[in-house]
């Protein structure tokens, strides 16, 4: 195929994309560049320009990048503590990762993020400070993927106008998404990561189409504060850590911030087998190991060791929410 035909196909793609963007000039230009680079990557990999344009069809964006960002969300009950618990160099950030068979192609991952966000509009937001509480505000902007350069779960700058409560990173064959816990919990984060990787694989041509749940329109229930609907079932958290004195552990806190990185390799099958032999769940077995480790790290014979464990309330209260919806057990 001639260079002129390739350029013509690319021009049609970018023209169609431009009609679906109502962004500031700089961000519009960056997003057009994202799609151009993704198309060039696909054609370099041997894909015909017409098929590359079909995979990157801007119609899949819907009107997401044309919308007016006039919606805001109060924090759900579980999320209110996270802004208040932030300190210099620490905030409640968690990470989920997926490992691919080959190295990540950044151009396609960036395009995959653009296609994934319309399915998760609650994630296209920023954190704002209100008179009494923080809240989450919708934004219409370009979100960017980046190479991984920092320690996992580093604090996020949520103070600026271009801030966001999640980030997408890549390193070799790993795709990682980190979330400020104010935005979502493990269930919502896993749904987002699964959709993102699925979209990436579709762009690569490894799968023909994405699952129906991702293609469907966002469900309003996904952004609900489920605690309000199930207040009676969730009840009140019990007791916290107040009461008897706690055991003091030996040693000093590590200086690495936000965390020291330790890697453990476990055989999931063997772990489940060990739990069954003790008539316990995997969670209960690991908590028992942690309790024994805490005892071993203490010189004191008296005092309580209590561990608070988040429980996914979706197992007990039927909700599709992608926001934080745990209760804690101890």
What does each model-identified segment do?
Residues 121, 184, 197-204, 276-279, ...:
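Hydrophobic/aromatic-lined pockets within catalytic cores
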Residues 175-177, 182-183, 271-285, 293:
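Conserved catalytic-core segments centered on acid/base and nucleophilic motifs
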Residues 2, 28-53, 174, 183-191, ...:
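Non-catalytic, low-complexity flexible loops and terminal extensions
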Residues 105-119, 189-199, 271, 282-294:
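Structural preference for long, well-ordered alpha-helical segments in enzyme cores
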Residues 1-134, 140-167, 178, 263, ...:
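Acyl-thioester-dependent acyl-group transfer interface
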């Amino acid at each position: 195929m001639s260079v002129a035909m390739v350029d013509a196909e690319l021009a049609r793609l970018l023209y169609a994309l431009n009609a679906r963007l109502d962004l500031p000039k700089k961000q519009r230009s960056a997003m057009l560049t994202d799609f151009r680079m993704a198309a060039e990557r696909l054609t370099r990999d041997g894909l015909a320009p017409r098929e590359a344009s079909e995979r990157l069809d801007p119609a899949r964006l819907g009107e997401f990048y044309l919308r007016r960002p006039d919606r805001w969300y109060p924090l759900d009950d579980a999320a209110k503590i996270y802004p208040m618990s932030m300190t210099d160099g620490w905030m409640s950030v968690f990470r989920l990762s997926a490992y691919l068979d080959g190295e990540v192609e950044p151009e396609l991952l960036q395009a995959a993020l653009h296609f994934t966000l319309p399915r998760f509009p609650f994630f296209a937001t920023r954190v704002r400070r209100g008179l009494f509480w923080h809240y989450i505000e919708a934004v219409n902007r370009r979100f960017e993927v980046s190479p991984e350069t920092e320690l996992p779960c580093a604090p996020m700058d949520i103070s600026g106008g271009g801030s966001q409560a999640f980030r997408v990173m890549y390193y070799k064959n790993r795709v990682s998404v980190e979330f400020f816990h104010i935005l979502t919990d493990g269930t919502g984060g896993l749904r987002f990561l699964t959709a993102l990787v699925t979209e990436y694989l579709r762009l690569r041509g490894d799968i023909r189409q994405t699952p129906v749940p991702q293609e469907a329109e966002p469900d309003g229930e996904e952004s609900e504060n489920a605690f309000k609907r199930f207040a009676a079932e969730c009840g009140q958290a019990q007791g916290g850590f107040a009461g008897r004195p706690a055991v003091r552990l030996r040693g000093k806190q590590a200086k690495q911030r936000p965390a020291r990185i330790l890697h453990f390799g476990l055989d999931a099958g063997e772990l489940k087998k060990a739990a069954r032999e003790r008539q316990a769940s995997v969670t209960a077995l690991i908590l028992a190991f942690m309790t024994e480790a805490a005892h071993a790290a203490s010189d004191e014979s008296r005092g309580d060791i209590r561990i608070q464990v988040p429980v996914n309330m979706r197992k007990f209260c039927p909700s599709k929410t992608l926001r934080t919806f745990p209760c804690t057990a101890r």
